[in-house]
Amino acid sequence: MKISIAQTKYRGLDFDKCLEDFKINYNEALLRGSDVLVFPSMFLDHTKYSELFGRSKYSQNICKCIEFIREQVDDRTLIIFGHSVYKDGKFVDIISVISDHKVILTVSQCNSPGFFTYKENVFAVLNFEDALLFKELIPKFGENLKKAQYLIIPSKSYFTKEKNNLRLKFFERVAVENNLDIVYSNFYGAEDSAVYDGCSFFINSFGKLKQAKGFEFDFISNDSFQDLKFDTCNELFEKIILAISLVLREYVCFSGFSKVHLGLSGGIDSALVACLACFALGAENVVGISMPSKFSSEGSISDAKELSRKLGFKLIEMPIKDLFEASSRSFESHFDVKGVTGENLQARLRGLLLMAYSNSQNSLLLNTGNKSEIAVGYCTLYGDTCGGLALIGDLFKTEVYDLVKYINAKFDQCIIPINIILKEPSAELRFDQKDSDYLPKYEVLDIILNRYLIDNESVDSIYLYFEKSIVDKVLNLYFKNEYKRRQGAPIVKVSKKTFGFELSIPILNNMV
């Protein structure tokens, strides 16, 4: 039996484009003689956008789309796709099976397959919950699964750096243990700051693989298989770059901006963001803005210039010395601007310049904060938290270094200057300042954050590996800075737990 997967683009509210994708791929399936065509879960996710789905216009559009598909599909091919539907006073996600202008089956319950027979083959259809991929035990989907020849999964699965390998390992076991073929269809494209990676696949009952491309359209059939191939470390780095690039291109396109800009400090975070922006949009559409103060080192200023030269983007220098002195004079009769007040004032003056440039040039400001800084609030609200999109906000500081090293190795040259990589991290808001004056070394900080936030490890367990005072300091900073995280730029999701997605706590809590 010939089964095909249409790996279509996520279209959100664009119902016309959804139907256009359907028609193109349905006709392709007919031309190829496909018996079954599987789409991802189509249309907007009602669980995230309940306000829209409370309006009759959107529910009516979905019903019209499903009715259009039913009218189009004749007896030559069977179509399987996921969608939302208004049922019993609420919206639910279901999977529909359509052939010969009739709905043969609908499946709504998560992780409980429905069954039908088509051309003497038994099919199981699964509304799969992505969270199961991160659990160690594979659930039993029922004894009836062993009677099926095919398990069909129309998905809408966000990209995370570990997820493709988890999907393949998970469904390889399901295929082999139940002696059936897996058909897994997924979107590609961006949904706000999250991204669908595609990577749809077939896995046969022998554990062999046929996989679609990542981050682009593909149309594949179950006509040839090879050994399972898991992502290597370098391939994961490449996918992170592709994911961030795809989100940025879509974000710029749909938000109506023509270019992007960022504050360029000469540090590794802004260097990586500039590099990723050039990869995604071309250097001609990227502007770096250097805003040195009297605390900025000569090395940071020259490193920013060297980065601009190597990547080919425009660099503008806007010193903040005069602005800072004028602001300080106007404030000093009312309050003292020394210490942290003066440090934050510098960051906010830089934010002022960056946002003014955005208004003036119709340019999207890219935030340059990393996940480590965001987690512990090592940032200035309305200063370096400004921006429309945070490209590296889901990468811990140590991961930033790893990605930079990969990029330099890939191009066999230091397109991100070696001085930027080797220098001690510093906000340069006072003389001789280092991040380690305030935080543990990033090698320690990131392990603590990973264990607590990502792996759900208990505090007592973490105490076994690090000094209690260090762990307590890190967690206290995390718990008291939710108010900053709530006001930050949307973060491009590349890990299984991301601020603004899975990671959220009450602003007012008694954990400090």
What residue ranges belong to the model's regions?
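N-terminal active-site segment of His-dependent metallophosphoesterases
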Residues: 1-39
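Active-site beta-loop-alpha substructure in enzyme catalytic cores
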Residues: 24-38, 111-177
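Short secondary-structure boundary/capping segments
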Residues: 51-56, 94, 166-169, 197-201, ...
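ATP/NTP-dependent adenylation/nucleotidyl-transfer catalytic domains that generate, transfer
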Residues: 23, 119, 179, 205, ...
